Amino acid sequence: MDISELTEELRKQAGRNVRLGYKVKFVLDDGLIFWDGTGDKPEIGNDDKGDADTTITMTAENLEKLIQGGLDPTLAYMTGKLRVEGKMGVALKLTSMFAD
């Protein structure tokens, strides 16, 4: 998946799940995805909206695997396939949303 397809997939995930309540920035190898989950309706796009509560850095390929359930988030973190800066609890909440 390219970054636009990943962005759309995250929009679908956000629409199926409860409000996140935080801002998350995914920094990928070919761009970024910013998820603002602080409002009534999540806003997800490719513009950098500034500071996020949590920044997750990984490859686009690994984000695709994570969304589709083919990558265990804990193992990915422990093996360096993803890095988390900021609130770790937000990252954990996101991964539980992907599992639903």
Regions found by a protein language model. Give the residues of each.
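Feature captures hydrophobic
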Residues: M1-D100
